[in-house]
Amino acid sequence: MLFRTYIHRYVHTKALRFLRFNPIKGRSLMAHIRRTRHIMMPSYRSCFSYSLFASQNKPSNRAL
């Protein structure tokens, strides 16, 4: 989760810099980030807690 947050912030920062130098392409890039934010950070658009979801999907200690 933290890695995804880091990637999203990194891309967002790059998009803001791009927006400063090229407003038209920068706006479309920011719109793309807004549309795909739920992939990188599921808690943004979901009603359940991502941490709860992650805790349910932890590998068990039992051998297969």
From Swiss-Prot:
Keywords annotated in UniProt: Leader peptide, RNA-binding, rRNA-binding, Transcription, Transcription regulation, Translation regulation
Superkingdom of the organism of origin: Bacteria
Disulphide connectivity of cysteines: none
Motif (Ornithine recognition loop): 32-38
Induction notes from the record: Induced by ornithine, repressed by putrescine. Part of the speFL-speF-potE operon.
InterPro entries on file: SpeFL
A GO biological-process term: regulation of translational elongation
Binding site for L-ornithine: 35
Listed GO MF terms: rRNA binding
Cleavable signal peptide: none
Function: A small protein (arrest peptide) encoded upstream of inducible ornithine carboxylase gene (speF) that controls expression of downstream genes (usually speF and potE) by transcriptional and translational attenuation.
UniProt subunit comment: Binds ornithine in stalled 70S ribosomes, blocking the upper two-thirds of the exit tunnel. Contacts 23S rRNA and ribosomal proteins L4 and L22.
Family: Belongs to the speF operon leader peptide family.
Name of the molecule in the record: Leader peptide SpeFL
UniProt lineage: Bacteria, Pseudomonadati, Pseudomonadota, Gammaproteobacteria, Pasteurellales
Gene: speFL
